[in-house]
Amino acid sequence: MCIVSHRYIPLTEKDKQEMLQTIGAKSIGELFGDVPSDILLNRDLNIAEGEAETTLLRRLNRIASKNITKETHTSFLGAGVYDHYAPSVVDAMISRSEFYTAYTPYQPEISQGELQAIFEFQTLICELTDMDVANSSMYDGMTSFAEACILAFSQTKKNKIVVSKGLHYQALQVLHTYAKTRKEFEVVEIDLDGTVTDLKKLEAAVDDETAAVAVQYPNFYGSIEDLEKIHSFIEDKKALFIVYANPLALGLLTPPGSFGADIVVGDTQPFGIPAQFGGPHCGYFATTKKLMRKVPGRLVGQTQDDEGNRGFVLTLQAREQHIRRDKATSNICSNQALNALASSIAMSALGKQGIYDIAVQNIEHANYAKQQFIKKGFEVLDGTSFNEFVVKFDKPIQQVNEELVKYNIIGGFDLGVVSDDFKNHMLIAVTELRTKDEIDTFVEKAGELND
C-alpha cells in the first residue's frame, strides 16, 4: 500500500514509480507505448501556477459575475424551465447526508427512508394526475414522453403515433431520436390552429393503425388543449391517449386522468428544482393499472414485514434491466431520486391549497401581462393559457432580447427557433414570482424597443 507523503496530493513521484514497478513498466511512456506518437502532446499542459485560495475565489467570483441569471435580472423566460418559488425547507432536507448521496438501492430493505421518500413521490404524482400508478421518476419530462410512446407501441402492437406540434419541440426531437432506432415506427405531427392543435386534422389522422395520440397540457405555446374533445377521437380506435402535463397547472386544471388519459408524463421542475443550465430535472410517468407491468423505471411498493410493520420494497422488478436486460421495458436504471425528493418536499410543504393558490397566481399574473401587452398595441395570440402566452413583435426576438438585457430583463423565448411560422414571436412566461412593477417595466421597455 502506498504512503502518500503530501496531504492533498494523492499521486507523488514515489507513488508513480511503485505502480510502474508493480506492473512491470519502466516509464509512463512505455506504459502508453501503444498510443501513436504523432497524437501525443509531448509537453506539459499549459496550466497557470497555483494561487492562494482567497485570490482564486476573488477571480472566480469576478468571472461568475459576468453571468446573466434570474438573481441578477428579472426573468420572463420559460419554455420548459420556470422561475418558481421553492420553500426553504427543500434545500435543508435534500442536503441531509442520508438523502444527498443516496442511490436507488438494489437491496431496498436497507434503505427504508429512501424508499419511503420515493413512495411518497409516486403517491403525490398519482394525486395530481388522477392516475393509478406512477414510477419513481425519470431523467426529465422529455425522456418520460418518449418512453410513453415506446410503451404505446409495445402495448398496441401498432406502429403509428399521432403527436401535436403543440408539444415541446425538444420532446418531439427526443421522440424522433427514439424512432430512428425502430424503422417501423411512424411519427405523424399535427399542425396547429393558432396556438392549439388543429382538431380537424388530428381527427382525420387517427385511424385503426394509430398506437397513441399525444398532446401537451398546457401546450408549449401556453394554450390549454381540449382534452375531452381529443379523447373522443381515440375511444373507438383502441389507441392510447398520452398527455404531457405541467404538474403545477394540475393544481388548478382538471387532471388528464379525468379525461381518460392512459399515460400522463411531465417534468416536476416547477416543484422545488431550480432553473440552472437546463438541468438536472425530474421526469414523472403515471399510468393505469392495466399498463402497470409495462411501466419503465422503478416502482416502490408498500408492504408489511413478519411482525406486521409497514415497509417498502422495489416491486415488479422483472420489468427492469438488471433482472432481464433483453426483455426490460426500459434500460433506465439510476433515476432522479434526489430531485424527486426535492419535488416531494416542495409539494408537501405547499399542500393542496398552496399548490392551488400558486397556480391561480400564475394565471392571474399571466393574464395581467397579456392585457398590458394588448394595451400597448402588441398582437397577443389567442388561446386560454396558464402562465405562458405568445406575443408578436415587429423586430427579431433575438435583437429585442439583447436590448432587454440592458434593462436587467431576461426576455421570453424566441419561437422563430422552432418554426418560421412564429418568426418575430416571443413566448413569455409569467410566474407567481413576477410582480406588477416587474411586468409593467417589461411591457414598457418591450414597447419602446418595438417602436
From Swiss-Prot:
One of its GO terms (molecular function) is glycine dehydrogenase (decarboxylating) activity. It is an enzyme of class 1 (oxidoreductase). Its EC number is 1.4.4.2. The keyword Isomerase does not apply. The keyword Oxidoreductase applies. It catalyses: N(6)-[(R)-lipoyl]-L-lysyl-[glycine-cleavage complex H protein] + glycine + H(+) = N(6)-[(R)-S(8)-aminomethyldihydrolipoyl]-L-lysyl-[glycine-cleavage complex H protein] + CO2. Pfam families: GDC-P. GO terms for biological process: glycine decarboxylation via glycine cleavage system; nucleoside metabolic process. Belongs to the GcvP family. N-terminal subunit subfamily. The glycine cleavage system catalyzes the degradation of glycine. The P protein binds the alpha-amino group of glycine through its pyridoxal phosphate cofactor; CO(2) is released and the remaining methylamine moiety is then transferred to the lipoamide cofactor of the H protein. The glycine cleavage system is composed of four proteins: P, T, L and H. In this organism, the P 'protein' is a heterodimer of two subunits. PANTHER family: GLYCINE CLEAVAGE SYSTEM P-PROTEIN (PTHR42806), GLYCINE DEHYDROGENASE (DECARBOXYLATING) (PTHR42806:SF1). This is Probable glycine dehydrogenase (decarboxylating) subunit 1. It comes from Staphylococcus aureus (strain MSSA476). The lineage of its organism: Bacteria, Bacillati, Bacillota, Bacilli, Bacillales. The gene is gcvPA.
